[in-house]
Amino acid sequence: NKIYDVKDLSNSTIKDITFFHSKKYEFLASKTKASFCITTENLKHFLPKKCNKIIVDNVLYATAKITNLFYPESINDDFDISAQNILKTSFNKKVKFGSNVLIGKNVKIGKKCSIGHNSIVEKNVIIGDNCSIGSNVIIRNTIINNNVHILDGCVIGKKGFGFFPDKIKNYRYPQIGVVIIND
């Protein structure tokens, strides 16, 4: 079986891997459609027989590691600003860019927009018409609709969900959702 995505118990399909870390979710675990589930020895019996169980000591840690394989942290470390990097990226009329702006693949920027100095717009971001993005802004996994103004220094869609403990230290839980900002 191939795994195509990481999803929660209730939204997973046969192509997904999910996780089950607390008995309070047993009603969802018994109905999951995921082909694979990360869980503990104590919880595995709540899962459907057709679901392949991956038994671990720390479910959240294992899920974070797998999620990072599907959703790498950031493009910032290996950002290539060559012309080939912005294939399939579209800029409409009258878009203004400050200096040192980085634009990822498959970005769509509407009409009459401005993006301030030192800002990063990562791949697959959509920015509507008449938007202004301040300086030193990072945007990831975001849809910005028309007439939105983002102030200097904002970070949108980068980190979320906080931390969870392991035996040695705390780990950041990966963010895989999309932020939608309306006017």
Language model regions located:
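Structural signal for interior beta-strand "rungs" in well-ordered beta-sheet cores
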Residues: 19, 83-183
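Terminal amphipathic alpha-helical/low-complexity segments used for targeting or macromolecular assembly
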Residues: 1-84, 112, 147, 153-154, ...
